[in-house]
C-alpha cells in the first residue's frame, strides 16, 4: 500500500462550465485555459458530457469534435480525457440504435477520448450494456457509474445489487476498473 498514489479526475471543463456558465465557454476561451491544465498532473480530465456537444453546436456554432481534438492535442497524453454519457441516450434525451452508438464512439475515440463514464439515471442495465461493450471493443475505457441517493427507501444493498448486476453481465471486471 505504500506505493499507492492519489489520482485526481478534474471535472472543470465539463461540469464546471456546465453548472456555472450553461456550457457556453467558447473554443477560444477553452484554448486560453488549456496551458494551465497541460502540466497540472490530473489523471483524468472530464471534458465532454451532459450538454457539451449539444451546446457547442447549438449556441456557439462550433464543432464538438474540434473541441475534443484540440484538447487532446494540447494535453499530448499527459491526462486521460473522459466524457460522461447517458448510455443508450448518449448526450441526448432519447435512446439511439446500436449503429449510432458505434459511430459516435468510434469518432470520439478517433478525436482523443480515452474514457467514457457511462450511467443511466434509473440504473437500467439495458441502457448502458451496449455502450460499455462498444467502448471496450473500440479500445476505450468504459467507466460504469451507478446513480444513488441518500433516502430511507434506498438502502445500500440497492446500489450494491446494481453493481453486482453489471459484474454479472460481464460489463465491469475488477481488472478494468480505473484506480
List the predicted regions and their residue ranges.
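Basic/polar N-terminal segments that are highly enriched at the extreme N-terminus
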Residues: 1-4, 164
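Short, polar loop/linker segments at the starts of domains and inter-domain junctions
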Residues: 19-27
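Short, basic, glycine/proline-bearing loop/turn elements
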Residues: 17-20, 51
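Short glycine-rich or small-residue beta-strand-to-loop segments that form or flank ligand, phosphate
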Residues: 13, 20, 115-119
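Short catalytic helix/loop segments, enriched in acidic residues and glycine
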Residues: 26-37
Amino acid at each position: 500500500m505504500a506505493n499507492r498514489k492519489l489520482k485526481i479526475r478534474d471535472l472543470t471543463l465539463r461540469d464546471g462550465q456546465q453548472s456555472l456558465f450553461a456550457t457556453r465557454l467558447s473554443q477560444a476561451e477553452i484554448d486560453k485555459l488549456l496551458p494551465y491544465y497541460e502540466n497540472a498532473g490530473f489523471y483524468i480530465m472530464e471534458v465532454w458530457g451532459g450538454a457539451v456537444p449539444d451546446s457547442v453546436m447549438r449556441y456557439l456554432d462550433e464543432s464538438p469534435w474540434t473541441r475534443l481534438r484540440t484538447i487532446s492535442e494540447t494535453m499530448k497524453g499527459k491526462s486521460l480525457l473522459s466524457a460522461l454519457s447517458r448510455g443508450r441516450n448518449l448526450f441526448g434525451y432519447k435512446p439511439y440504435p446500436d449503429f449510432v452508438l458505434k459511430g459516435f464512439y468510434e469518432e470520439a475515440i478517433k478525436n482523443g477520448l480515452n474514457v467514457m463514464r457511462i450511467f443511466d439515471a434509473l440504473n437500467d442495465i439495458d441502457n448502458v450494456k451496449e455502450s460499455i461493450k462498444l467502448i471496450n471493443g473500440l479500445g476505450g475505457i468504459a467507466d460504469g457509474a451507478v446513480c444513488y441517493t441518500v433516502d430511507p427507501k434506498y438502502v445500500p444493498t440497492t446500489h450494491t445489487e446494481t453493481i453486482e448486476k453489471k459484474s454479472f453481465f460481464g460489463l465491469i471486471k475488477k481488472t478494468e476498473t480505473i484506480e
